[in-house]
Amino acid sequence: MTIHTSRIIMSTDAFLTLTQWLSPGFPVGAYAYSHGLEQVIDCGDMRDAKALQDWVEDILEHGSGTSDGILLAASYKALPEDVSRIDAIARAFASSAERVTETVDQGAAFAKAVDAIWATDLGQLCYPVAVGRAACAQGLPLDLTLEIYTHAFAANLVSAAVRLVPLGQTEGQAVLAALAPLIRQVARRCHDAGIDDLTTACMALDIAAMHHETQYSKVFRT
Protein backbone atom coordinates (compact mmCIF):
# COMPACT_ATOMS: atom_id res chain seq x y z
CA MET A 1 0.00 0.00 0.00
CA THR A 2 1.34 3.43 -0.97
CA ILE A 3 1.11 6.14 1.68
CA HIS A 4 1.05 9.70 0.36
CA THR A 5 2.62 12.12 2.85
CA SER A 6 3.26 15.28 0.81
CA ARG A 7 -0.04 16.91 1.74
CA ILE A 8 0.45 16.07 5.43
CA ILE A 9 3.94 17.59 5.44
CA MET A 10 2.80 20.75 3.65
CA SER A 11 -0.14 21.14 6.01
CA THR A 12 2.12 20.71 9.03
CA ASP A 13 4.57 23.32 7.71
CA ALA A 14 1.72 25.79 7.21
CA PHE A 15 0.37 25.11 10.68
CA LEU A 16 3.77 25.64 12.31
CA THR A 17 4.38 28.88 10.42
CA LEU A 18 0.98 30.29 11.35
CA THR A 19 1.24 29.29 15.00
CA GLN A 20 4.62 31.03 15.11
CA TRP A 21 3.28 34.20 13.51
CA LEU A 22 0.21 34.34 15.74
CA SER A 23 1.67 33.08 19.00
CA PRO A 24 1.99 35.40 22.03
CA GLY A 25 5.76 35.22 21.56
CA PHE A 26 5.78 36.80 18.10
CA PRO A 27 6.97 40.42 18.49
CA VAL A 28 3.81 42.38 17.72
CA GLY A 29 3.15 43.47 21.31
CA ALA A 30 -0.35 41.96 21.42
CA TYR A 31 -0.15 41.62 25.22
CA ALA A 32 -0.28 45.43 25.51
CA TYR A 33 -3.74 45.77 23.94
CA SER A 34 -7.10 44.99 25.57
CA HIS A 35 -9.28 46.22 22.65
CA GLY A 36 -11.31 48.33 25.10
CA LEU A 37 -11.92 45.58 27.66
CA GLU A 38 -9.87 47.43 30.30
CA GLN A 39 -12.50 50.18 30.32
CA VAL A 40 -15.33 47.60 30.42
CA ILE A 41 -13.75 45.94 33.45
CA ASP A 42 -12.95 49.26 35.12
CA CYS A 43 -16.64 50.20 34.88
CA GLY A 44 -17.66 46.94 36.55
CA ASP A 45 -19.35 45.48 33.47
CA MET A 46 -17.20 42.33 33.46
CA ARG A 47 -16.73 40.58 36.80
CA ASP A 48 -16.60 36.86 36.00
CA ALA A 49 -15.89 34.25 33.33
CA LYS A 50 -19.49 34.18 32.11
CA ALA A 51 -19.42 37.92 31.38
CA LEU A 52 -16.07 37.54 29.62
CA GLN A 53 -17.45 34.81 27.37
CA ASP A 54 -20.50 36.92 26.53
CA TRP A 55 -18.38 39.93 25.59
CA VAL A 56 -15.91 37.96 23.48
CA GLU A 57 -18.72 36.12 21.68
CA ASP A 58 -20.21 39.48 20.69
CA ILE A 59 -16.82 40.77 19.53
CA LEU A 60 -16.24 37.67 17.43
CA GLU A 61 -19.70 37.60 15.87
CA HIS A 62 -20.50 41.29 15.52
CA GLY A 63 -17.24 43.21 15.94
CA SER A 64 -13.56 43.06 15.09
CA GLY A 65 -13.47 39.27 15.17
CA THR A 66 -15.49 39.25 11.97
CA SER A 67 -14.32 42.51 10.37
CA ASP A 68 -10.65 41.59 10.85
CA GLY A 69 -11.29 38.20 9.27
CA ILE A 70 -13.00 39.75 6.26
CA LEU A 71 -10.14 42.23 5.83
CA LEU A 72 -7.59 39.42 6.12
CA ALA A 73 -9.39 37.33 3.50
CA ALA A 74 -9.81 40.31 1.17
CA SER A 75 -6.11 41.17 1.34
CA TYR A 76 -5.18 37.51 0.80
CA LYS A 77 -7.26 37.36 -2.39
CA ALA A 78 -6.44 40.87 -3.62
CA LEU A 79 -4.31 41.94 -6.54
CA PRO A 80 -1.24 43.89 -5.36
CA GLU A 81 -2.65 47.17 -6.65
CA ASP A 82 -5.79 46.74 -4.52
CA VAL A 83 -4.05 46.19 -1.17
CA SER A 84 -3.68 49.89 -0.31
CA ARG A 85 -7.44 50.40 -0.72
CA ILE A 86 -8.18 47.48 1.61
CA ASP A 87 -5.69 48.86 4.12
CA ALA A 88 -7.39 52.27 4.01
CA ILE A 89 -10.74 50.59 4.70
CA ALA A 90 -9.18 48.74 7.64
CA ARG A 91 -8.00 52.03 9.15
CA ALA A 92 -11.39 53.63 8.59
CA PHE A 93 -13.10 50.71 10.30
CA ALA A 94 -11.13 51.23 13.53
CA SER A 95 -13.64 52.90 15.85
CA SER A 96 -11.27 55.04 17.95
CA ALA A 97 -7.82 56.61 17.83
CA GLU A 98 -6.44 53.86 20.08
CA ARG A 99 -7.93 51.17 17.84
CA VAL A 100 -6.13 52.71 14.87
CA THR A 101 -2.90 52.60 16.87
CA GLU A 102 -3.59 48.99 17.84
CA THR A 103 -3.99 47.72 14.29
CA VAL A 104 -1.34 49.95 12.68
CA ASP A 105 1.38 49.31 15.26
CA GLN A 106 0.80 45.57 15.36
CA GLY A 107 0.77 45.45 11.57
CA ALA A 108 4.07 47.33 11.38
CA ALA A 109 5.70 45.07 13.98
CA PHE A 110 4.38 41.94 12.25
CA ALA A 111 5.62 43.10 8.85
CA LYS A 112 9.05 43.99 10.24
CA ALA A 113 9.55 40.50 11.69
CA VAL A 114 8.11 38.60 8.71
CA ASP A 115 10.07 40.68 6.19
CA ALA A 116 13.30 40.00 8.08
CA ILE A 117 12.80 36.24 8.43
CA TRP A 118 10.77 35.23 5.36
CA ALA A 119 12.19 37.82 2.92
CA THR A 120 8.82 39.37 2.11
CA ASP A 121 8.14 43.05 1.44
CA LEU A 122 4.84 43.75 3.18
CA GLY A 123 5.19 47.48 3.77
CA GLN A 124 3.11 49.49 6.25
CA LEU A 125 -0.20 47.67 6.60
CA CYS A 126 -2.82 47.21 9.30
CA TYR A 127 -2.50 43.96 11.20
CA PRO A 128 -5.13 41.75 9.49
CA VAL A 129 -4.14 43.08 6.08
CA ALA A 130 -0.46 42.34 6.76
CA VAL A 131 -1.27 38.81 7.94
CA GLY A 132 -3.38 38.17 4.85
CA ARG A 133 -0.67 39.36 2.48
CA ALA A 134 2.03 37.40 4.30
CA ALA A 135 -0.04 34.20 4.22
CA CYS A 136 -0.69 34.67 0.50
CA ALA A 137 3.01 35.30 -0.19
CA GLN A 138 3.99 32.12 1.64
CA GLY A 139 1.26 30.02 0.05
CA LEU A 140 -0.44 29.27 3.37
CA PRO A 141 -4.07 28.10 3.26
CA LEU A 142 -6.59 30.89 3.80
CA ASP A 143 -8.96 28.74 5.86
CA LEU A 144 -6.21 27.75 8.30
CA THR A 145 -4.90 31.32 8.45
CA LEU A 146 -8.35 32.62 9.37
CA GLU A 147 -8.92 29.99 12.06
CA ILE A 148 -5.58 30.57 13.78
CA TYR A 149 -5.80 34.36 13.47
CA THR A 150 -9.30 34.41 14.96
CA HIS A 151 -8.26 32.04 17.74
CA ALA A 152 -5.24 34.22 18.56
CA PHE A 153 -7.45 37.32 18.62
CA ALA A 154 -9.87 35.68 21.06
CA ALA A 155 -7.03 34.29 23.17
CA ASN A 156 -5.52 37.76 23.56
CA LEU A 157 -8.84 39.17 24.80
CA VAL A 158 -9.16 36.31 27.28
CA SER A 159 -5.59 36.85 28.46
CA ALA A 160 -6.26 40.55 29.06
CA ALA A 161 -9.36 39.74 31.12
CA VAL A 162 -7.54 37.08 33.14
CA ARG A 163 -5.06 39.75 34.22
CA LEU A 164 -7.59 42.54 34.81
CA VAL A 165 -10.75 41.03 36.33
CA PRO A 166 -8.84 38.99 37.61
CA LEU A 167 -9.75 35.43 36.66
CA GLY A 168 -7.94 32.17 37.24
CA GLN A 169 -5.87 30.77 34.39
CA THR A 170 -8.07 27.68 34.26
CA GLU A 171 -11.21 29.83 34.05
CA GLY A 172 -9.70 31.72 31.15
CA GLN A 173 -8.79 28.55 29.30
CA ALA A 174 -12.29 27.17 29.87
CA VAL A 175 -13.74 30.29 28.23
CA LEU A 176 -11.37 29.93 25.27
CA ALA A 177 -12.29 26.27 24.84
CA ALA A 178 -15.98 27.15 24.90
CA LEU A 179 -15.38 29.73 22.16
CA ALA A 180 -13.77 27.21 19.76
CA PRO A 181 -16.95 26.34 17.79
CA LEU A 182 -17.73 30.03 17.28
CA ILE A 183 -14.14 30.75 16.23
CA ARG A 184 -14.39 28.09 13.51
CA GLN A 185 -17.79 29.42 12.43
CA VAL A 186 -16.54 33.01 12.15
CA ALA A 187 -13.45 31.90 10.22
CA ARG A 188 -15.59 29.96 7.73
CA ARG A 189 -17.93 32.91 7.26
CA CYS A 190 -15.05 35.31 6.65
CA HIS A 191 -13.47 32.94 4.13
CA ASP A 192 -16.40 33.36 1.75
CA ALA A 193 -17.15 37.02 2.52
CA GLY A 194 -16.12 40.02 0.46
CA ILE A 195 -15.13 43.53 1.43
CA ASP A 196 -18.73 44.67 0.85
CA ASP A 197 -19.81 42.36 3.68
CA LEU A 198 -17.95 44.43 6.28
CA THR A 199 -20.14 45.45 9.19
CA THR A 200 -19.87 45.99 12.93
CA ALA A 201 -22.39 46.15 15.75
CA CYS A 202 -20.38 46.26 18.99
CA MET A 203 -21.32 49.77 20.04
CA ALA A 204 -20.81 49.24 23.78
CA LEU A 205 -17.24 48.05 23.24
CA ASP A 206 -16.54 50.80 20.70
CA ILE A 207 -17.69 53.41 23.23
CA ALA A 208 -15.55 51.75 25.91
CA ALA A 209 -12.55 51.93 23.57
CA MET A 210 -13.16 55.66 23.10
CA HIS A 211 -13.47 56.26 26.85
CA HIS A 212 -10.25 54.31 27.42
CA GLU A 213 -8.34 57.10 25.69
CA THR A 214 -8.99 59.37 28.71
CA GLN A 215 -9.10 56.70 31.42
CA TYR A 216 -7.08 58.04 34.36
CA SER A 217 -5.15 54.90 35.29
CA LYS A 218 -4.59 52.09 32.82
CA VAL A 219 -2.38 49.08 32.22
CA PHE A 220 -3.10 48.51 28.50
CA ARG A 221 -2.53 50.77 25.52
CA THR A 222 -6.12 50.23 24.33
Swiss-Prot record:
User: Which superkingdom is the protein from?
Assistant: Bacteria
* Cell location: Cytoplasm
Give the family, as the similarity comment puts it.
Belongs to the UreF family.
* One Gene Ontology CC term in the entry: cytoplasm
Molecular function per GO: nickel cation binding
Major location category of this protein: cytoplasm
The identity of this protein, by name, is Urease accessory protein UreF
Q: Pfam families from the xrefs?
A: UreF (PF01730)
Q: Which keywords accompany this UniProt record? A: Chaperone, Cytoplasm, Nickel insertion
The role this protein plays is: Required for maturation of urease via the functional incorporation of the urease nickel metallocenter.
As recorded in Swiss-Prot or TrEMBL, the protein's gene is named: ureF
Q: How does it assemble?
A: UreD, UreF and UreG form a complex that acts as a GTP-hydrolysis-dependent molecular chaperone, activating the urease apoprotein by helping to assemble the nickel containing metallocenter of UreC. The UreE protein probably delivers the nickel.
